[in-house]
Design a protein with these regions (language model features):
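Beta1/beta-strand and adjacent pyrophosphate-binding region of the FAD-binding site
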Residues: 9-19
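Glycine-rich FAD pyrophosphate-binding loop
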Residues: 12-14, 26-48
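Glycine-rich nucleotide phosphate-binding loop and flanking beta-alpha elements
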Residues: 20, 43, 149-151
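A generic structural signal for short, well-ordered alpha-helical segments in conserved domains
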Residues: 24-25, 114
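N-terminal glycine-rich dinucleotide-binding loop that anchors FAD/FMN and/or NAD(P) in oxidoreductases
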Residues: 49-72
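Conserved N-terminal helical subregion
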Residues: 59, 63, 73-156, 161-167
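Flavin-dependent oxidoreductases
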Residues: 167-177
């Protein structure tokens, strides 16, 4: 005689970014109930934004979250040049048989996760209005993935130091698939 006891866990995730969606999908795959709270934003999604991802992370994402192989652009060769010496090549990474890493468009993985989550009976999107402690008492775990959330501002804002003294260059690369 075997009795199977199933613990029903309910998780609250704050924020609707790529991290929160991937986490929600991984939990839903384990049949854990997830409510994802989001704030309505009037920002446009940058369709040219890409993410670099290593082979081991691709394998993990495919196994635990969702298959992203069709979205990937493999990178087998990387060359780094310097502006100071007439565009002289200073570093070169190359691997003929394996990919160094891959890139994918942020918007594509974001949209795929939303579509898959909406199909699950274990997942709900909920609009975040105002923090009330009583709204969160029914959850076994609350995960905050949104640095702009009022809970973060209330309890952790003095803990973060921000120094954005960096420069980033971006480009759109045409290549054969």
């Amino acid at each position: 005689f075997l009795v199977k006891i199933k613990f029903i866990m309910k998780v609250c995730i704050l924020g609707d970014n790529l991290t929160s969606l991937a986490l929600a999908k991984a939990l839903v795959k384990k049949e854990i109930f997830v409510d994802l709270f989001y704030e309505k934003k009037n920002t446009k999604i940058d369709t040219t934004r890409t993410i670099g991802i290593s082979k081991s992370n691709i394998d993990f994402f495919n196994r635990e979250i969702t298959n992203i192989n069709k979205m990937l652009w493999p990178i087998k060769k990387i060359k780094i040049f310097t502006e100071n010496s007439n565009d002289k090549e200073i570093l070169k990474f190359e691997d003929q048989k394996d990919n160094l890493f891959s890139i994918l468009q942020n918007q594509k993985i974001f949209n795929q996760l939303i579509i898959e989550l909406k199909k699950s009976k274990f997942f709900k999107f909920k609009k975040y209005i105002k923090y009330r402690k009583s709204d969160y008492l029914s959850y076994d775990l609350i995960i905050n993935c949104d640095i702009r959330n009022e809970i973060t501002k209330k309890y952790f804002s003095k803990k973060f130091e921000k120094e954005y003294n960096s420069i980033a260059f971006t480009t759109i690369i045409d290549h054969l698939k």
